[in-house]
């Protein structure tokens, strides 16, 4: 839909201020896309492939050379594409999508078929390109671990409906919006503390589990909770924030927590 292959059933799409339906040419000028395994001329070299696209898009030779260096293909760019590994073909496809210096890069299942080393290399190239070119990157993928490593914000979609849009904390590599904490207490105090915590206005829920007490509370309220429990002479062995990965959050939002 973002590249104009299908029309939206309702609403509108604007890319850099250009309406995709009424100003298609200018809107798509701001977009680059790599859809799974890019189609390339295997009998041509990598450079010849890029020059074919450059001529159509009026891209200078200098910009072609800059893009080749950006994706790290300068050592093999004059080899025939039929000799390229899958990872190199992905890099060449990425280079082709970057030639016109788009403001939006769309990647659809970009790491399908790549080995772990190829996935890591491709991820680093994308992150480098996004930083140097100052562009937004949309990634569509069913490989949640790769999305978690590559993206800083995710949208959970189920049956065409966005369930939530949340940030990923780059330092902890976990969902930034998560407010769960685990409170470890003695078994004798669990029920008593649960009843006390449920009275607090900044606590959404509190339940006993095998770890202790799982508490969901408002942001920046952990210190208030600890102070309240201490003032009421409850013995707390440990308290920590439970960090959830993308897969666990997906199960909660899309699958209802059922495994």
Residue ranges and their predicted role:
Residues 124-216:
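ABC transporter nucleotide-binding domain
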Residues 17, 57, 186-187, 219, ...:
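Short loop or secondary-structure boundary microenvironments that flank
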Residues 42, 145, 191, 223, ...:
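Alpha-helical elements of the RecA-like P-loop NTPase motor core of helicases
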Residues 1-139, 144-164:
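ABC transporter nucleotide-binding domains
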């Amino acid at each position: 839909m973002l590249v104009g292959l299908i029309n939206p059933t309702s609403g509108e799409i604007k890319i850099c201020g250009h309406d995709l339906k009424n100003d298609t040419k200018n809107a798509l000028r701001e977009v680059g896309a790599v859809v799974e395994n890019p189609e390339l001329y295997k009998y041509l070299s990598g450079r010849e492939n890029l020059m074919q696209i450059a001529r159509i898009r009026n891209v200078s030779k200098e910009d072609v050379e800059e893009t080749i260096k950006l994706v790290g293909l300068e050592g093999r760019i004059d080899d025939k594409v039929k000799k390229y590994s899958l990872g190199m073909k992905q890099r060449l496809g990425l280079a082709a999508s970057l030639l016109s210096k788009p403001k939006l890069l769309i990647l659809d299942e970009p790491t399908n078929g790549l080995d772990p080393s190829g996935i890591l290399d491709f991820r680093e190239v994308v992150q480098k390109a996004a930083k140097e070119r100052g562009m937004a990157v949309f990634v569509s993928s069913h490989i949640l671990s790769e999305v978690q490593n590559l993206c800083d914000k995710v949208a959970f979609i189920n049956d065409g409906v966005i369930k939530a849009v949340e940030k990923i904390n780059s330092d902890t590599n976990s969902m930034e919006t998560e407010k769960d904490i685990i409170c470890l207490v003695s078994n004798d105090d669990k029920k008593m503390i649960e009843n006390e915590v449920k009275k607090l206005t900044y606590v959404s829920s509190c339940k006993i589990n095998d770890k202790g007490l799982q508490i969901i509370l408002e942001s920046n309220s952990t210190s208030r909770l600890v102070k309240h429990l201490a003032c009421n002479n409850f013995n707390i062995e440990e308290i920590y924030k439970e960090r959830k990965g993308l897969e666990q959050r997906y199960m909660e939002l899309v699958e209802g927590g059922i495994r």
